[in-house]
A protein has these predicted regions:
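Positively charged n-region of N-terminal signal peptides that target proteins for export
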Residues: 1-8
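Short acidic, flexible loop segments centered on an aromatic residue
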Residues: 50-74, 116, 169-185
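Bacterial N-terminal signal peptides
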Residues: 8-18
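Asparagine-centered strand-capping/turn motif at beta-strand->loop junctions
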Residues: 43-49, 162-170
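Beta-sheet-dominated interaction scaffolds and their linkers
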Residues: 24-49, 85, 150-157, 190
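Terminal connector regions
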Residues: 101-151, 207-210
Length: 210
């Protein structure tokens, strides 16, 4: 299963962990997000396997991403999405859409999307009727964020202590390079900070590109 843009995160399980006790969110790829005033969010996904696959989708709300996240069912049609399930032939493409019908205020909202892929093999044995053969289902997860009505990107940086705090009302991504050389091709250290979260890391206090 190949998922374009934010669905690339589904090539493997989403890696989410916290660095010591800093309560900063680390993930292996981008978080999907939309502005609260947008009518819907849409991304294509492609079945790049050699089998016909059944894809099923589910979404629920969480307090915030992380190991101790608390999930709750979607209330009052706040989130609508389509399709609920879809069978794709090898190489076939479909669009997954999310419609946000909740409040447009200064609160950032977080959701977890679960996409399950089940190979479905149709065979015809010795002239008998075609029988569907199911294989184990693989479920993959990613996060979806609805930003506040008026996103406020603010932070507090205490360089001598190596502390970075998100003082705004929406998450942002941070990239730390090992040095300030513009030609440095080394992989940057990437993490995300949610509102009111902070991280303490020696790399922040070092002379580097941020």
């Amino acid at each position: 299963m190949k998922l374009i843009s934010w669905f690339k995160i589904l090539c493997g399980m989403l890696l989410v962990f916290f660095y010591h006790h800093a309560y900063a969110l680390y993930i292996s790829a981008d978080i999907s997000s939309m502005e609260s005033g947008e009518p819907f969010f849409s991304k294509p996904y492609i079945n790049d396997t050699k089998k016909t696959n059944l894809y099923t989708f589910s979404v629920y709300q969480i307090d915030r991403p992380g190991y101790q996240e608390q999930g709750t069912p979607i209330q009052n049609g706040e989130i609508l999405f389509t399709p609920l399930k879809k069978i794709l032939l090898p190489g076939e493409q479909e669009f997954f859409k999310i419609f946000y019908r909740g409040e447009a205020d200064e609160k950032e909202r977080y959701y977890k999307i679960i996409i399950s892929e089940t190979p479905l093999d149709i065979r015809n044995d010795e002239g008998q009727k075609k029988q569907p053969l199911f294989y184990p289902t693989v479920s993959l997860e990613t996060y979806f964020v609805v930003r506040p009505k008026d996103p406020d990107f603010k932070y507090d940086l205490t360089i001598n202590q190596g502390i970075l705090k998100n003082t705004g009302n929406t998450y942002f991504r941070v990239l730390l390079h090992q040095n300030c050389d513009g030609d440095d091709d080394s992989e940057p250290y990437v993490f995300y900070l949610l509102p009111n979260q902070q991280i303490k890391d020696l790399r922040i206090s070092q002379k580097s590109r941020k």
